[in-house]
């Protein structure tokens, strides 16, 4: 299966690594650059740690930085995602809010483009606790049957809320090609 690339190839690489097949042998069979295979090995190693180690803050940070969802951690520990989420929050393993530097550090950038990451321990912005606002969920990436018209619905929702006096309207979206992700559409993105 490693010599036939399809949409399952990364899973086959992970299975091969779990079986103890070396990175070099997987490379010979798959022609996938060893650098990528080693990255998959790192993920497999963390999964094994999750299965066989005590779940503490350090291991949760490591897993979250590697991109593990609470559901995946729960599966490895034979617990529910809610239990993992509660434990994670109680241990203070929560993502930080970071600003995207749209000017590549050439000049100070003050933007409303934000993202969540487990790769930091402090927030780039502080939102006052007494500040109220509304979050509008965007349509996400374009796909067949869902496109510009759904994004336009997001934009019109934001504009309508602003016209009705809402000062803090944030949009959550994961498609940088959309109008709803333009910097001047909402308070925070």
Spell out what each predicted region is:
Residues 1-189:
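ATP-dependent carboxylate/acyl-activation modules
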């Amino acid at each position: 299966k490693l010599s036939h690339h399809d949409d399952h190839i990364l899973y086959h690489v992970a299975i091969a690594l779990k079986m103890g097949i070396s990175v070099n042998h997987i490379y010979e069979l798959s022609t996938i650059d060893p650098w990528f295979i080693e990255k998959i090995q790192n993920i497999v190693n963390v999964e094994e740690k999750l299965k066989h180690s005590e779940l503490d803050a350090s291991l949760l940070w490591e897993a979250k930085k590697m991109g593990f969802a609470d559901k995946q951690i729960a599966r490895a520990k034979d617990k529910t995602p809610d239990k993992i989420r509660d434990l994670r929050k109680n241990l203070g393993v929560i993502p930080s809010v970071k600003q995207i530097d749209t000017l590549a550090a050439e000049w100070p950038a003050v933007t409303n483009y934000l993202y969540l990451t487990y790769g930091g321990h402090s927030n780039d912005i502080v939102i006052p606790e007494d500040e109220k606002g509304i979050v509008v969920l965007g349509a996400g990436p374009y796909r067949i049957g869902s496109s510009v018209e759904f994004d336009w619905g997001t934009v019109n929702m934001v504009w309508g809320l602003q016209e009705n006096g809402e000062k803090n309207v944030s949009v959550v979206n994961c498609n940088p090609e959309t109008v709803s992700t333009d910097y001047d559409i909402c308070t925070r993105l």
